[in-house]
Amino acid sequence: MKKSFLFAMMLCCAQLLSAQQERIDLSGTWRFQADPMGFGKTPGSELYQAKLTESIMLPGSTDEGGKGMLTTARYVDRLTRKFEYCGQAWYQREVIIPEEWKDKEITLNLERCHWETTVYVDGKEIGAKEHLSVPNRFLLSKQMTPGMHILTICVDNRLKYPMDQWNHGTTEYTQTNWNGIVGKIELTAYEKTNIHALKAYPDIETRTVTLDITVNNTTGQPTNGLLQLVINEKGGKTVSEQSFPITLKEGSNQLIKEISMGKNIKLWNEFTPYLYEVKAMLTADNKQDSKNITFGMREVTQGKHHIQINGRNVHLRGALDCCVFPLTGYPSTTIEDWKRIFLTVNDYGMNHIRFHSWCPPEAAFHAADEVGIYLQAELPMWIKDVGQYPARRDFFEKEMYAILEEYGNHPSFILMCNGNENEGNFNVLEDLVKKAQKHDNRRLYSASTARTHTPSDQYYVSHVTEKGWITVYEGKPSTDWDRKKESDIDCPVIAHETGQRCMYPNFAEMEKYTGVVSPRNFEVFRERLARNGMLHQADDFFRATGAHTVLQYKEVNESLLRTANSGGFQLLGLADFPGQGSAFVGILDAFWESKGLVSPEKYRESCAPTVLLARMPKRTYMNNETFTAKLEIYHYGEHPLKRGKLNWELKDGKGNTVKKGNISTPAIPCATVDSLGKVNISLNKVSHAEKLTLHTTLNDTYHNEWDIWVYPCQQTAADDYVYARTYDEKVKTALQQGKKVLLIPENVKGRKTKFASHFWNPHKNTCSFSYLAYASWCRAYIFPIHSLYRVYYDNIRHHVSYAV
C-alpha cells in the first residue's frame, strides 16, 4: 500500500512538472501580415525575415481578426462571411526558451490549421505541413535553443489540391474557407528519451488491454530505463500498476505490454460510457518523461446486419455534422462545446453522429467518449474523379493514417469512411480501406458513403443497395412497410441522409448571428416576403412548415425502426444546413438549439432506444370500416423489458374515447423489433368527418401516437351549395343568382403536388431530381375559418392547421 502511494505521488509530481515547466502556451497577440498574392516567400520580399506590423489574436482566424476584404455580397445559397481572405497570411511572435530546456526535444504543436502551414525560426524555414484533420507538429530542437527567438508561421488557405467545392473540410458552404490556427498553439519540451506514442488495444474476451508504446531515444547511444504503467478507472480506483526494466536502442523503440484489467471490467457503450486512464512514465538516464491517454473497454465488430458493440447489435439513430459553426466559421476545439452538442443529440433520442466529409478536433472525440455517442469520421473527400492527381491521393492516404494515429484510442470512434458520395476509381478507395484495416482494427471501415459498395466494406452507408432503396425521405399513406428486403445484403447497411425536408426560415434566428458570418440569405428571403405583402405571416409560415417537417421526420424515423435488419440511419438533419442553397431541414437551428417546433420528449416518442410502432394499412377510413393496426416495439435499450401491459386508446379531437383496451406483453430482449399485438376498432360511432388519434403506452413509460382521418360513408350535399367540377354556364348562373358554389376542378394546369415538402431546398439542383417535377413548396398554411372546415374544429378562434 505504501509502495503504491509513493509511486502514485511520484507520477503526480512528474506530471505537475511537465504541466508547469515543459509547455509554453503561445496563445495571445501575434504580429500579422496579409499576403494574398503570395509574394512573401519570393526573393526580395521575404516576409519571414521581416518584422510584421499588424496584429491578430491566436487561436483565431483572419475573419475574426477583421482581415481581408469587407464583403457586401448577399449570397442566398449560404451564409456570407463578413471578411473574406484567401491566400498566404503571416503570423509572428517572439518566444523565450528557458535554460531548463537545453538539450531537450522541442516540438511546436499547431492544432487545426487551414490549410498549408510553413514554419520559420529566426528567418530560416523549418518545413511545411498540410494536415486538415490533426495538429501540425514541427520538431524545433536544433533551432529553439535557450533564449529569445522569432517564430514566424505562414498559413495558406488556398486549395492545394483539386477538392471540388462541397467537402466540409474546405468548403465555403458550412465552416467557410478560413485562414488561421484555431486550436492549441504551444511549444512542448521532452527528454531525449521520451514516450512518443501510446496506444491501447482492449480485448473484452480476455479482459486485457494491450499497450503499444513507442519510445524515442535520441541520445545517440543505447540506454536502459524503467517503464512504469498505471491504469485507473477515470476518476476512480487503480486497476493495474506495473513497472518494467527496458533496454532502448538508438532511435525508435516499440514496446508491447499486455495488462490484465481484472475480473470486473467496465465496458464502454452508449449507456455506460466508462473510461480508463493509462499513465505511462519513463525513467532513463535519471530523467523522466510521461504520457497519459484515456480509452474504453469496447469492441466493434461486423454482424450480419448490424454493427456490434461488445458483441451486441446496435442500431444507429444518427444525424449529420457538416461542420456548421456560425459564430466562428470553424469547429470548436473545446470539450464543453462538443458535450453540449452531443448531449443535445442524446436528448433527441440519437446515439450517433456522422462527420460528413471531415474529421473533428480531438475535443469532439473526448466529449463523445464521455457522453456515449458513436462517431463516424471521414476524410475531407467528396470528389467526382477519385484516382486522379497522384499528389492528392498521397495527401488523402497521409491524412487517413494521421487520423488513426491521433484519435485511434477513443472508444467513440467506431466507424471511418473515406468520404461522401465519391465517384471515380473505387479501387483506390478500397485500397485505402485495406490499409486502414491493417493499420488499426479498433473500428470498422468503408470505402465511401454512398455510390458504390466495395468487397472490403465492413459496413455500408448508402441511399440504395443492389436490392433497392433503403434511404427514406418521406412517409406514405400506409405505415405497414419497411426496408427489410432492401437492407438484406452482405454487411450492415445504414440509410444515408434520410429526411432532408425543407421548411421556412425562422427570421427571429437572425439576431443570433453575432460572429464572422452574416445571415444575408435570411435578409433576401425576408425582403421577398415584404415585397409580396406577407412579412406579417413569416412566423406562421415558419411554424406551419416546421410542424410539417417534424411530422415527416416521425414517419422517416419510424420506417427505419420498423426495419428489423436495418443497421441504422443518418438523418439530414437534426440541425439546419445553412449552405448549398440554404437548407433549413433541421428541427434545431444551425446553433444546435431548439426552434421551438418539437420538444425532445415528444421527438423521442419516435426516435429513442425504445419506441412503440404501429403498422397501419392506411390512414383514411369511412365510418363503415374497421380500423386495424399491428403494434410493434423497437427495443435497443440497455436492459431487456419485463412482461407488462400495453394500453391503447383511440380518441377524437375533443379527447373523448372512441375505444380503448390493453394487451399483455411478453418480456422483450434487447436489440429487437417485436410484435406486441393487433387492434381492431369499428368506426361506426364516428358520425362526421374528423381526425382521430391512436394513443399507445407501454408500462406507463413508453408512449407513441398516430393520427387517422374518418369520413361519413353517406355523402350529403348542402342545400345552399352548388357542387361543380368545371366552371361552366351552370356555375355562372348559380353565382348570378347569389348561390354558393363549391368548385373542385378535375383538370388544373400546373405542377402536381404531394404531401411531402420540398427536398433539401428550392435553390440547389432544382432540375437534378425527378421528383422535383412536383411543385416546390413547403406545405400549406390554413386558417380553418371557412365552413368547409367547421366539421373539424369546434372553436375556430383557437385552431390553426399547420399541416394538411
Describe the role of every protein-language-model region:
Residues K129, G372-L379, V741-P745:
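Short hydrophobic/aromatic-enriched beta-strand-loop microsegments
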Residues D720-H763, A780:
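Short alpha-beta junction capping motif
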Residues K749-V804:
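An acidic, glycine-rich "communication" segment
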Residues R31, H114, R158, E423, ...:
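Short, solvent-exposed loop/turn segments at secondary-structure junctions
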